[in-house]
A protein has these predicted regions:
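Helical segment within the ABC ATPase nucleotide-binding domain
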Residues: 169-181
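Catalytic Walker B motif of ABC-type/P-loop ATPase nucleotide-binding domains
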Residues: 154-158
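Conserved ABC transporter NBD signature motif
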Residues: 56-67, 71-72, 76
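A short, proline-enriched helix->beta-strand linker immediately N-terminal to the Walker B motif
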Residues: 148-152
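Conserved ABC ATPase "signature" region
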Residues: 96, 100, 107-125, 176
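Hydrophobic anchor residue at the start of the ABC signature
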Residues: 143
Length: 183
């Protein structure tokens, strides 16, 4: 569960986020809609601990994102608007690197990678350099990184950007599947 309480992000006199409060329950799919500059990405960056709020509180599974950042982040898989990919790595190398960063036990990594590659339809791309992938496939690699370890909470910032209409449907179906099946 995520609880956002009176969240404020101010840049000088401009409010990017102005006293926003909401709760997202386990298994719930929750989205932000709004025009460019409405504070959607800013809110997600605060929720994941990548940006500090001016005021307010974010609790992730009961952990305050500022007071217990490691415990809170361990519950979150995050796909930012622009996935932080390493173009000189293969898909598999990158995901193994991410598994190590996420402290997934070594003996579980191969199984985790196999599952994530299958869910994101990247099995045939695992040996390819990320630099040689289309934008749609790079987006899938970012999504695979976010769901690696099957975190309780997955935060996706524009997960279907760069995907063709068929891939958009597949990713939305995957998100619904994860909401139903992720422990």
């Amino acid at each position: 569960m995520i609880e956002v309480k009176n969240l404020v992000k101010r840049y000088g006199d401009h409010y990017a986020v102005n006293h926003l409060s909401f709760t997202v329950e386990d298994g719930q799919i929750f989205g932000f809609l709004g025009p460019n500059g409405a504070g959607k990405s800013t809110t997600m960056n605060i929720m994941t601990g990548y940006l500090a709020a001016t005021e307010g509180q974010v609790l992730v599974e009961g952990h305050d994102i500022l007071e217990e950042p490691e415990a809170a982040r361990a519950c979150i898989g995050y796909l930012p608007e622009i996935p932080p990919l390493y173009p000189d790595m293969t898909v598999e190398e990158y995901l193994r690197f991410c598994a190590e960063l996420k402290k997934i036990p070594k003996e579980q990594r191969t199984d985790q990678l196999t599952k994530v590659l299958a869910l994101t339809h990247l099995e045939d791309m695992s040996a390819r350099l990320i630099r040689n992938l289309s934008k749609g496939y790079r987006q899938r690699v970012g999504l695979a990184q976010a769901i690696l370890g099957f975190p309780k909470i997955i935060i996706l910032d524009e997960p279907t950007v760069g995907l063709d209409p068929k891939q958009v449907v597949e990713i939305r179906d995957l998100i619904r599947h994860l909401a139903r099946t992720t422990p």
